């Protein structure tokens, strides 16, 4: 049985969402690690497992300041479920790219599992997604952005690697 009341879990997840929303605007990704306990674990299936705030901070800053993370502008949850018995929050997060110039929306979701530790902090986060869908979404976004003169300069090397035949 979870020792945390439902209201505390709700408040912690609301704070998580608010902080991520603020970070998406400010681009101060180093703040993200402060949502976790000092010994937290972050599992990201494509990038690996990160132990502790320092590793989480280093990874998130590096990931979100280089393409394609640097072109993601919003991460709202589509839905969420709170498992009171375990103290978990499970949600679907929309990873939304910036407007590529034609107002089209390019996004790919992931499932996030947050394990609550108390005092407003999470002990772990695990992100689960399908890279076979994520990569084509980013490629499609980049093609549209390039056609509208809005492809960031740091995206060219990524496109050369993940979009064979691209000659932007």
Question: Which role fits each region the language model picked out?
Answer:
Residues 29-89:
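A solvent-exposed, acidic/Ser-Thr-rich amphipathic alpha-helical stretch
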Residues 53-54, 101-104, 133-141:
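A short, polar/proline- and glycine-enriched secondary-structure boundary/capping micro-motif
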Residues 74-75, 105-112:
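Short, surface-exposed coil-to-beta transition loops
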């Amino acid at each position: 049985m979870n020792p945390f009341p439902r209201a505390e879990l709700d408040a912690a997840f609301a704070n998580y969402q608010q902080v991520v929303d603020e970070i998406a605007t400010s681009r101060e990704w180093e703040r993200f690690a402060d949502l976790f306990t000092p010994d937290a674990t972050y599992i990201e299936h494509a990038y690996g497992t990160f132990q502790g705030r320092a590793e989480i901070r280093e990874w998130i800053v590096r990931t979100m300041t280089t393409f394609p993370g640097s072109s993601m502008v919003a991460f709202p949850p589509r839905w969420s479920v709170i498992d009171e018995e375990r103290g978990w929050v499970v949600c679907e997060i929309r990873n939304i790219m910036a407007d590529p110039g034609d107002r089209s929306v390019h996004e790919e979701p992931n499932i996030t599992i947050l394990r609550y530790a108390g005092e407003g902090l999470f002990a772990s986060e695990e992100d689960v997604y399908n890279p076979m869908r994520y990569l084509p979404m980013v490629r499609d976004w980049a093609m549209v952005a390039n056609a509208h003169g809005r492809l960031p300069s740091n995206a060219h090397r990524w496109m050369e690697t993940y979009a064979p035949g691209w000659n932007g």
